[in-house]
Regions:
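Repeated scaffold domains used in trafficking and secretory/extracellular systems
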Residues: 71-77, 116-122, 163-169, 232-237, ...
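Residue-level detector of Asp-centered blade-edge/turn motifs that repeat once per structural unit
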Residues: 79-81, 125-126, 172-174, 179-180, ...
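Short, conserved, GDST-rich strand-edge loop motifs in beta-rich repeat architectures
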Residues: 133-136, 186-207, 249-262
């Protein structure tokens, strides 16, 4: 991304309203209120914001607050103070911290062209430190960059021992083999790209996807695991409700279309080994080898499959349960043990149930396309 692009984006953003708050009368008064931090594209412009609805079928999902951003956003993170962090889709040049509904302006962090954001950021439990996956533009090597949450200044940087690092999650289990010390699990997507061609994939025969465990205090490598099939990119992560298993959404990068379309979309990690979970034929081919967002509830695993226009569901043991139809399904989140899934014109409450509850998208979302991820706002 050039300095000219950054200056142009800043000039555009200077003329944008930082926050748009919908009046409270726009929302229904029945059922419990649900709010989700999300990102979307609408008529060529890009936004992050807060979406709001109430529990119960037919309650519209409305835009409650929004911030226009210069390019597509990807991952979001909510801090304990209620502020929302969002990063640009890889290779991204911006990260923003924003407090919806306060009237205060957003806090921007721009890359200098020597590195890029990889789409995901994670906060420490107290919200004081941020951990983002980033990539060096010259070498292609990925890192975890630790930043102060208030100033966004870098305080540490650790290698992920791979390329194309994507999502990262905490492992705070006492029985994780590392005492009571929290560790970070990071998915190295392993897909080679070049700074001059952005997201264009190249040299896929050299793919090297893995998950790594890092000491969260020092960044020391504590373990690294790979699948047998090197053309499966490990990307998005979610713990089972009991934290015994980590689910990983996969994206296939095989040269052969048939192999790519029938590839699994889910892998499971028990702390010592990785294994893929396959859907039965002919369902597997319909999934197109592309897993988007990842979530887990007491009912089981959910992997959004936007190319299949549905959500692939599995038991917690990995048995196939079914494909929940939802056009352009992508963002997933869990609230009170129930799965919320976002689609093109409506979203689903309790999407794994026999009869999910549909929430039509309100006027602010009509014609909009939700991005890959959203996060439930508590309270």
């Amino acid at each position: 991304v050039t300095d000219l692009h950054r200056r142009q984006a800043l000039a555009v953003l200077a003329g944008l309203g930082a926050c748009v708050i919908a009046p409270s009368a726009a929302f229904a008064t029945t059922g419990n209120r649900v709010q989700l931090a999300a990102a979307w594209e609408h008529q060529g412009s890009f936004h992050i914001g807060v979406l709001s609805t109430h529990e119960g079928a037919g309650q519209a999902l409305q835009v409650h607050a929004s911030l226009e951003v210069p390019t597509r956003a990807h991952g979001l993170c909510v801090l304990p103070d209620g502020s929302v962090l969002a990063t640009a889709r890889r290779p991204g040049d911006w990260l923003v911290r924003w407090q919806p509904g306060t009237g205060s302006g957003p806090q921007w962090l721009w890359q200098d062209g020597e590195r890029s954001f990889n789409g995901h950021v994670l906060a420490s439990a107290d919200g004081r430190r941020l951990y983002a996956t980033e990539t060096d533009a010259e070498t292609g090597a990925s890192s975890i960059v630790v930043r102060d949450a208030c100033t966004l200044a870098k305080t540490a940087e650790w290698p992920t021992h791979g390329i194309d690092a994507h999502e990262l999650v905490w492992d705070t289990r006492g029985g994780n083999g590392h005492g009571n010390n929290p560790t970070l699990i990071v998915a190295n997507g392993g897909v080679p790209t070049a700074p001059e061609t952005g997201r264009v994939k190249r040299d896929l025969g050299t793919m090297d996807s893995s998950i790594v465990r890092l000491d969260a205090r020092t960044g020391r490598l504590l373990g690294q695991w790979r699948l047998q099939d090197p053309r499966l990119s490990l990307r998005h992560l979610a713990w089972s409700p009991d934290s015994a298993l980590l689910g990983i959404a996969l994206q296939a990068e095989h040269d052969d279309a048939a192999a790519r379309n029938t590839a699994p979309v889910l892998a499971l990690f028990d702390g010592s080994a990785l294994r893929v979970v396959a859907a039965p034929e002919p369902v597997a081919q319909s999934l197109r080898g592309y897993g988007g967002s990842m979530a887990a509830t007491p009912t089981g695993w959910a992997v959004s499959c936007p190319r299949a226009h549905g959500i692939a569901t599995f038991s917690l043991q990995g048995d196939w349960q079914g494909l929940v139809p939802l056009p352009e399904a992508c963002p997933l989140a869990v609230r009170g043990g129930a799965l919320w899934a976002g689609g093109l014109t409506s979203s689903l409450q309790n999407a794994q149930a026999a009869a999910p509850l549909a929430h039509p998208h309100g006027s602010g979302l009509r014609g909009a396309r939700l991005e890959n991820h959203w996060v439930v706002l508590q309270g």
